[in-house]
Amino acid sequence: MPSVSSSAANGSQDVALSVRDLVKTFLVGGGVFGGEKGEVSAVAGVSFEIGAGRTLGLVGESGCGKSTTARSILRLIEPTSGEVVLTRPLDGGGSERIDVIAADRRQLRELRRHMQIVFQDPFASLNPRMSVGTAIGELLHVHTNLTRKERSDRVGELLSLVGMNPNVADRYPHEFSGGQRQRIGVARALALNPGFLILDEPVSALDVSIQAQVLNLLEELQDRLGLTYLFIAHDLAVVRHICDDTAVMYLGKIVEQASTDRLFTAPMHPYT
């Protein structure tokens, strides 16, 4: 594993995620007629840190690069350059800082245990032909040696954790409301006990009353499990409610970052 450094004492490392000069460019042009190719910088040198157990909001209008940043951090798409350092706990105590971008395929598979994502549209991210119990247990099947009975028990625990009856595990995504499906998405993301979650517009597709319920659930889970969140959104009211710190993104760059209270009361950048 491409370790950056390690700490022998629990809690001595208080930065859960450090992103430095993250760049993602896409080739454009060419096409069937062989026109001139160019590059578009969707993410142009983004840097930030998230303290352990805290929530950083990443805000900006559609197309500014928020979701591309998230997917680059997890390497769901490959970043062009930069550094993403994740702090993960070590067996027996202490912690280790891992360069996600430098990890090979096997190492990245191991890192998936420690970082997960909850998508905006839970229906699109759930296989309609797969029961929710199977969908939640899929990661357990791939990444653990649990027996079928142990996986089933764990799925029940996860459903209970997000406020759902374990008996619904045999039902299918279309049988649930949008808010329930998002709870299922959260349960699946928590299956491997990750310490870091990216929440990519997790409530934007929900009614306002359901938004509040899901946001309260996310806060409860953070307090209970010590989770660290990168919360991507365009709704400033939601960000103000849940985020400790906020970074404002514009045209692929972060133009301002501060505590959420300071940013909302005394913004410094004109775009903010």
Report the location of each language-model feature.
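ABC ATPase NBD coupling module
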Residues: V32-K37, G92-Q116, V142, R148, ...
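P-loop NTP-binding/switch modules centered on Walker-like glycine-rich loops
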Residues: E61, L206, I210-T272
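Helix-to-loop junction immediately C-terminal to a conserved catalytic motif
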Residues: L74
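Conserved ABC ATPase "signature" region
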Residues: G92, K149-N167, E220
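Hydrophobic anchor residue at the start of the ABC signature
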Residues: I136, V186, I210, V214
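Conserved ABC ATPase signature
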Residues: Y172-F176, Q180
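A short, proline-enriched helix->beta-strand linker immediately N-terminal to the Walker B motif
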Residues: A191-G195
